[in-house]
Amino acid sequence: MSSSSWLLLSLVAVTTAQSLTEENAKTFLNNFNQEAEDLSYQSSLASWNYNTNITEENAQKMSEAAAKWSAFYEEQSKTAQSFSLQEIQTPIIKRQLQALQQSGSSALSADKNKQLNTILNTMSTIYSTGKVCNPKNPQECLLLEPGLDEIMATSTDYNSRLWAWEGWRAEVGKQLRPLYEEYVVLKNEMARANNYNDYGDYWRGDYEAEGADGYNYNRNQLIEDVERTFAEIKPLYEHLHAYVRRKLMDTYPSYISPTGCLPAHLLGDMWGRFWTNLYPLTVPFAQKPNIDVTDAMMNQGWDAERIFQEAEKFFVSVGLPHMTQGFWANSMLTEPADGRKVVCHPTAWDLGHGDFRIKMCTKVTMDNFLTAHHEMGHIQYDMAYARQPFLLRNGANEGFHEAVGEIMSLSAATPKHLKSIGLLPSDFQEDSETEINFLLKQALTIVGTLPFTYMLEKWRWMVFRGEIPKEQWMKKWWEMKREIVGVVEPLPHDETYCDPASLFHVSNDYSFIRYYTRTIYQFQFQEALCQAAKYNGSLHKCDISNSTEAGQKLLKMLSLGNSEPWTKALENVVGARNMDVKPLLNYFQPLFDWLKEQNRNSFVGWNTEWSPYADQSIKVRISLKSALGANAYEWTNNEMFLFRSSVAYAMRKYFSIIKNQTVPFLEEDVRVSDLKPRVSFYFFVTSPQNVSDVIPRSEVEDAIRMSRGRINDVFGLNDNSLEFLGIHPTLEPPYQPPVTIWLIIFGVVMALVVVGIIILIVTGIKGRKKKNETKREENPYDSMDIGKGESNAGFQNSDDAQTSF
């Protein structure tokens, strides 16, 4: 047999083997899809029941259903790993196997998987049920939603915002801290079991794309693209930041630095994520009609159902389908009135079997009106790819899913659209001033959140990589917050806190970079859809409602789900394969030009050294080695606890003796910041149970003076090795003369004048006496040699005796 015949037979054999492998894989996937949909639905339904009725019973049922789904998925994942991807030629089969070969948390042992689920459920419960009590009215204890969110959205009282902000992090964040530490360890272990470097690397894997002709994209490119686009956006953000800072100085004149960072609790919501609620304080042209239509919605009697009905009308107007009957029957669109504890954070649910729902404690506001469009955008995406195989029912990447609803929000927020649905009056006229008002409102929501998102995810990526030890989580968090976002903590936080986990997405295990990438994508999509709608004009004025051409172009992309590389799906809509920030910058260009003009005489950027509590802080410097030599001990967290407790003791003593008040200061009321390795730091003191009441520095100094010796003795140091800079180094208060300094000086001068007069008088008397003596006979003792210093005291004139002045 010729060599060519052998080659032909070999190729046939290989092709036959590949065909059998692919056929077996296809059969396996068909069986998986049928069984997976049922088990996934039961798990999702149990999760829905828990999120809409938080009870121990529902938590247990959710855990049981999740365990069944996890066990099934683990088994199927192992089977999928037996198929060689090199032998699979059909792309859609290969993509499903690739997805299933990633076993997720099933890669952990059964015990660790159970532990991880318990941690996640506990964190979710703490977040959803956490309460903060008003220090001025301890009986008034508020959930985040509704309650604290209202304070953070509307209050302009600095101290009210502060106790809500701090209380949420103290009550919830501190409880989450040990759980989040365990979560990081287990998630990293899970990621490595799935052949990723860490959990951040695992998350970024969602952006990987394989495909011919340049559609490839690796997860490291995501980091590069995020860094690149953020650098392009930063100048716009810096000018927005400078403008907002100047406006906030009008509302909080004593609490804002004209060159410093912005206090985190003044930025519109609990996290400073969206600055939307700052619009009333920063509106450029307040005399113009209000483009925030909240009042119009209230006056017209809108409710939650009306909000979602209007959102549905928008999607239908571009040719997308109505919501299902089950959606309206099963969704939770308002907070239940029956007292159930629920997770209010808005989420869209694709439970499977055509069951689509939204969970949201809707309020009648423009912000919630736009949020409804966003969440319904998720549902539209879910419905569009519902015919894809189970494993491909997802967005092209996570950012695509978030972007779809945001596209609709861009159009729904335009004055043109609001006018068309009666939320702006028919005689509303757009001009350059209303244009700037509109763009600023959009920027507060869209541009203001980008550094927040970027910085949060960068911090988590560094934590998962082990680049930030857990002993420095909060220190690094606030350093990065100051440097990247230009935001400063209103109170210093030590390592007992877990401020990142005070955000829903962190405590509930969501990747967050999706909210950054979605913002870039949404403007790319918007530009392309406006072109499809044959719109000519400024991008920020485009409203694609009623354009079925735009809707069909979008639907084509949505229907793909995750069956194609996201780079290809993006190209199908926008004609490009990568993130491009230019459409976003074009959208905001008129505002950017205006902001630069407004900021001509303002400092643009921020000084990271400034803090709201700097004026009341006292610096401490400790010299252990110079004081104790070989006996010097290490300054640890325990030593810091002892220091704070000692100051708390001093404050109790001072208030008891000087003010005749019993005030139960604790170590937690002594706020320490800026700890340096050479042992120096700052501290100030707040009232117990009321963080917004800062004790004046002068009173803290008096308390330290009163107890200085006791504090020194605790650490075996003295005034020179335990320095309170600015406080006199003595056990007693500095000497205060009983009369003023000028009076003392005047007295000294007058005394010298009197003494001078006396000397002149005495000298005159002596001179006269000497003249009289020359008339007497010669002194018999003139021949005596007195050069040797001898004198006869018996004959010394009493007036010549030496007397000290």
Swiss-Prot record:
Residues linked to a glycan: N53, N536, N546, N660, N690
SUPFAM superfamilies assigned to the protein according to its UniProt record, in alphabetical order: Metalloproteases ('zincins'), catalytic domain
Entry GO terms, CC: apical plasma membrane; brush border membrane; cell surface; cilium; cytoplasm; extracellular region; extracellular space; plasma membrane
Binding-site residues, chloride: R169, W477, K481
Extracellular side: 18-740
Residues on Cytoplasmic side: 762-805
Membrane topology: Single-pass type I membrane protein
Annotated crosslink Glycyl lysine isopeptide (Lys-Gly) (interchain with G-Cter in ubiquitin) location: K788
Biased composition (Polar residues): 793-805
Family, as annotated: Belongs to the peptidase M2 family.
Annotated spans, Essential for cleavage by ADAM17: 652-659
CDD domains, per the entry: M2_ACE
Residues of the signal peptide: 1-17
Higher taxonomy: Eukaryota, Metazoa, Chordata, Craniata, Vertebrata
Record-listed Phosphotyrosine modification sites: Y781
Post-translational modification: Proteolytic cleavage by ADAM17 generates a secreted form. Also cleaved by serine proteases: TMPRSS2, TMPRSS11D and HPN/TMPRSS1.
Function statement: Essential counter-regulatory carboxypeptidase of the renin-angiotensin hormone system that is a critical regulator of blood volume, systemic vascular resistance, and thus cardiovascular homeostasis. Converts angiotensin I to angiotensin 1-9, a nine-amino acid peptide with anti-hypertrophic effects in cardiomyocytes, and angiotensin II to angiotensin 1-7, which then acts as a beneficial vasodilator and anti-proliferation agent, counterbalancing the actions of the vasoconstrictor angiotensin II.
InterPro entries with a match to the protein in the record: Collectrin_dom, Peptidase_M2
UniProt protein name: Angiotensin-converting enzyme 2
Domain Peptidase M2: 19-607
Collectrin-like domain mapped to chain residues: 614-805
Xref: Pfam families: Collectrin (PF16959), Peptidase_M2 (PF01401)
Gene it is expressed from: Ace2
